[in-house]
Amino acid sequence: MFNSNVKLGIAPIAWTNDDMPDLGKENTFEQCISEMALAGFKGSEVGNKYPRDVEVLKKALELRDMEIASAWFSAFLTTKPYEETEKAFIEHRDFLNAMGAKVIVVSEQGHSIQGQMETPIFDGKYVLNEEEWKTLAEGLNKLGALAKEKGMKLVYHHHMGTVVQTTEEIDKLMDLTDENLVYLLFDSGHLVYSGEDALEVLKKYVNRVKHVHLKDIRKKKVEEVKRDKLSFLQGVRKGAFTVPGDGDIDFEPIFKVLDDNNYEGYLLVEAEQDPAIANPLEYAIKARKYIKEKTNL
């Protein structure tokens, strides 16, 4: 299964959490990438403890035969002047380009509640009006063109608590944006958490999917988040997310759709948990074994 153009990566968020820095504060950058390599992963996204000096970061990764797959970028196209987002995006793009990454992960954070500790994730989500949708799509097309200038692709990350979370919102975004400028990051965990049919979304947009986050969920924990009106971050602390093979999502059909459509790019394990409870190396190894078992990668 899968051709040689599919790579495996893992996100540092299991070791150190960017949104809640107390989670994993004791874990160093070197420990993080060493354990990723030890578990058998090639790529990483960029965490808050990673050096931003290209040469320093490259050397640390090359010592472990690793590379940067991408890094998250927060856009504020619906709440701030476009120029502010563009300036930050160009800087982000150039850093990733220097690191050899091919895709740029973008998520609209205007009106987002994902980082609010007390806002119920299932109740407080903002819904864009038509004018805001137009602003978002036009801005993303411009950013996508800037990515293309460097031979890179903008991959949009649908995410819990943001203005693009549901199937309907993903449909709207895909419809309003240029398919040659704006691509999709498929995140299994965020779709299932939201109550969507992740497989159907993947089937519909597989040819625009250029980056994949393999995230599993514990359905009982998600039900508790909904019942107790917890925030996204409170859900993370509760253990709503985990690595593939440890939760309730069946990844075999997901792998099959990707393989049948000749997916190329990264399959990146991303599962934020409390590292004091879920040992990052142990869970990285668990994920790696599961992926090997199901895909032979």
Curated annotation (Swiss-Prot):
One of its GO terms (molecular function) is manganese ion binding. It comes from Clostridium perfringens (strain 13 / Type A). InterPro entries: IolE, IolE/MocC, IolE/XylAMocC-like, Xyl_isomerase-like_sf, Xyl_isomerase-like_TIM-brl. It comes from the Bacteria. This is Inosose dehydratase. Belongs to the IolE/MocC family. Its cofactor is glutathione; Co(2+); Mn(2+). The gene is iolE. It catalyses: scyllo-inosose = 3D-3,5/4-trihydroxycyclohexane-1,2-dione + H2O. One of its GO terms (biological process) is inositol catabolic process. Pathway: Polyol metabolism; myo-inositol degradation into acetyl-CoA; acetyl-CoA from myo-inositol: step 2/7. Keywords: Cobalt, Lyase, Manganese. Its EC number is 4.2.1.44. Disulfide bonds: none annotated.
